[in-house]
């Protein structure tokens, strides 16, 4: 698979990173909010709840949280083992690496900049006077939007669908994995594993390189 340029699109929460960003944010609200949001996240990622509806409910729980708290929570986000190796090795081989997330630009922008991702897309939190309103600003990045992002980026860069790779763990990654030339389930829920061409059960994101024939640097 190394002869032609590839597009590798990564989910963020629990794939590119070890954490669910919205769960980290909820801890800054209250213990009760943290438990509620974490439970909804688990059900949504297992494909047992509609993602858009579940995200709307979880974001409502963040109303009143300050943007300073968002910055503080972002500082606690942990990259997955092997994430930097995956990104840098793929780019060194001439491939593009992107991220698309049902999480938030406010948390993902610094991560994308630090890693040097070629493209990224996520939801935006609405804020007023420095406080979150509990709403999303703009369209929700759901399963359909993830699939659309993969296809749009591939078309923009003249990359054939067969040369696209999608990596994710949750139910909202299924459409993206199914649309990619190679769909990789990484430490994934059962619903995601069933849709994948490749399953990685070891917590090392650089193993994606081995599956798509890209050398490590």
Give each language-model segment a name.
Residues 1-125, 203:
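Alpha-helical substrate-recognition element adjacent to the catalytic core
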Residues 74-217:
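C-terminal cap/substrate-recognition subdomain and adjoining C-terminal extension
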């Amino acid at each position: 698979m190394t002869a032609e340029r590839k597009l590798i699109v990564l989910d963020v929460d629990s794939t590119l990173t070890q954490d669910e960003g919205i769960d980290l944010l909820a801890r800054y609200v209250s213990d009760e909010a943290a438990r509620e949001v974490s439970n909804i996240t688990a059900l949504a990622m297992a494909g047992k709840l509609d993602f858009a509806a579940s995200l709307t409910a979880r974001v409502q729980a963040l109303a009143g949280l300050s943007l300073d708290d968002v910055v503080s929570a972002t500082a606690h986000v942990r990259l997955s083992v092997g994430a930097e190796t995956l990104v840098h090795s793929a780019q060194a081989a001439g491939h593009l690496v992107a991220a698309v997330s049902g999480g938030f630009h406010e948390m993902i922008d610094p991560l994308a900049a630090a890693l040097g991702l070629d493209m990224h897309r996520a939801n935006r939190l609405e804020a007023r006077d420095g406080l979150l309103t509990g709403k999303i600003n703009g369209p929700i990045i759901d399963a359909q939007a993830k699939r659309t992002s993969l296809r749009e980026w591939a078309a923009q860069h003249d990359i054939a669908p067969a040369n696209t790779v999608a990596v994710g763990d949750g139910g909202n990654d299924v459409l993206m994995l199914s649309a990619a030339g190679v769909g990789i389930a990484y430490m994934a829920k059962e619903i995601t594993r069933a849709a994948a061409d490749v399953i990685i059960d070891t917590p090392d994101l650089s193993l994606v390189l081995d599956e798509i024939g890209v050398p490590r640097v």
